[in-house]
């Protein structure tokens, strides 16, 4: 009866030894890179085995785990996948990921993972957050203010067109809310822009003071309090032109008439051929 107990003890001991022997370490909690440049994410691991597999995964804001690249320990040649490549040093137990020509879509959390050849369980590192800074051409920083036409206590400030080196910080005023820096990528126009939004319900809220805790360029354009955008003016600018609508309807009607004439001629021709 002692044999089953011994076997269970052996299994538990083996599992504990495996969990203690295999570790994955990522020493870079966060890395940043300028768009189109190269960045390297480091990863080290500890194992007593000689046959195993290594992986790099990326986790975008959607939280989905996406396999980037894998490396078999028995292969001496480093794995490559388009712009992604690894530097695998088996003796040093190092497995770094190199990303060339960084794109905005590369921004994500990257996880290094280890898997034994005899165990399907993946062991992950803590992850490295990669931030890709857009390459802004000819930045022209400006702050615009929009007030609600129905309530003077509601105001929104848009800080836009600033370079990637500018950091946007939260306001010390608890009544002022500022979003994180976001990137507008208009690929059809080959144009990128950084932007951040601040808002408050305070009646004395002014855009000139909204970003006081952020280091912004000295040449940033600020509107005067009298020149803030009015919602009614914005809505009016999008009103349709009656004459333009009539012309569009006329063109559509003319095209329909031409199609009917062409269809009638085709029908008469077919009837003549059939007779």
UniProtKB/Swiss-Prot annotation:
Chain residue ranges for the region called CDR2: 71-81
GO molecular function per UniProt: signaling receptor activity
Residue ranges of domain Ig-like C1-type in the record: 154-242
Glycosylation sites: 78, 167, 201, 212, 248
Function of the molecule: The alpha chain of TRAV38-2DV8*01J31*01C*01/TRBV25-1*01J2S3*01C2*01 alpha-beta T cell receptor (TR) clonotype that displays pan-cancer cell recognition via the invariant MR1 molecule. On CD8-positive T cell clone MC.7.G5, likely recognizes tumor-specific or -associated metabolite(s) essential for cancer cell survival, triggering killing of many cancer cell types including lung, melanoma, leukemia, colon, breast, prostate, bone and ovarian cancer cells. Mediates cancer cell cytotoxicity in an HLA-independent manner. Has no reactivity to healthy cells, even stressed or infected by bacteria.
Name of encoding gene: TRA
UniProt keyword annotations, A-Z: Adaptive immunity, Cell membrane, Disulfide bond, Glycoprotein, Immunity, Membrane, Receptor, Signal, Transmembrane, Transmembrane helix
Residue stretches making up the Ig-like V-type domain: 22-116
Record's protein name: T cell receptor alpha chain MC.7.G5
Cited PROSITE patterns: IG_LIKE
Pfam families named among the record's database cross-references: DUF1968, V-set
Assembly mode: Disulfide-linked heterodimer with TRBV25-1*01J2S3*01C2*01 beta chain. The alpha-beta TR associates with the transmembrane signaling CD3 coreceptor proteins to form the TR-CD3 (TCR). The assembly of alpha-beta TR heterodimers with CD3 occurs in the endoplasmic reticulum where a single alpha-beta TR heterodimer associates with one CD3D-CD3E heterodimer, one CD3G-CD3E heterodimer and one CD247 homodimer forming a stable octameric structure. CD3D-CD3E and CD3G-CD3E heterodimers preferentially associate with TR alpha and TR beta chains (via TM domain), respectively.
Keyword Transmembrane: yes
Signal sequence segment: 1-21
Tissues expressed in: Expressed in MR1-restricted CD8-positive T cells.
Sequence segments annotated as region (Connecting peptide): 229-250
Transmembrane segments: 251-273
Region (T cell receptor alpha joining 31): 119-134
Coiled-coil ranges per UniProt: none
PANTHER family: T CELL RECEPTOR ALPHA CHAIN MC.7.G5-RELATED, T-CELL RECEPTOR ALPHA CHAIN V REGION-RELATED
Cytoplasmic side: 274-275
């Amino acid at each position: 009866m002692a044999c089953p107990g011994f076997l269970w003890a052996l299994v538990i001991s083996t599992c504990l030894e495996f969990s203690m022997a295999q570790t994955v370490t990522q020493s870079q909690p966060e890395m940043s890179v300028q768009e189109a440049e190269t960045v390297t994410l480091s990863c080290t691991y500890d194992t007593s085995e000689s046959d195993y597999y290594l992986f790099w995964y990326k986790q975008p804001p959607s939280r989905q785990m996406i396999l980037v690249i894998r490396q078999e320990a028995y292969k001496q040649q480093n794995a490559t996948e388009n712009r992604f490549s690894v530097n695998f040093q088996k003796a040093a137990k190092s497995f770094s990921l190199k990303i060339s020509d960084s794109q905005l879509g590369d921004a994500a959390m990257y996880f290094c993972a280890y898997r034994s050849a005899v165990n399907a369980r993946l062991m992950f590192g803590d992850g490295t957050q990669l931030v890709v800074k857009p390459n802004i051409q000819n930045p022209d920083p400006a702050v615009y203010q929009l007030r609600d036409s129905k309530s003077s206590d509601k105001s929104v400030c848009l800080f836009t067109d600033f370079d990637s080196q500018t950091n946007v910080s939260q306001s010390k005023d608890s009544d002022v809310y500022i979003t994180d820096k976001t990137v507008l990528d208009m690929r059809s126009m080959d144009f990128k822009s950084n932007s951040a939004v601040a808002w408050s319900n305070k009646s004395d809220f002014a855009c000139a003071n909204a970003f006081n805790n952020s280091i912004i360029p000295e040449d940033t354009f600020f509107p005067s309090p009298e020149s803030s955008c009015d919602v009614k003016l914005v809505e009016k600018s999008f009103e349709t032109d009656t004459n333009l609508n009539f012309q569009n309807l006329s063109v559509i009607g003319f095209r329909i008439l031409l199609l009917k004439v062409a269809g009638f001629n085709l029908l008469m021709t077919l009837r003549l051929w059939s007779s």
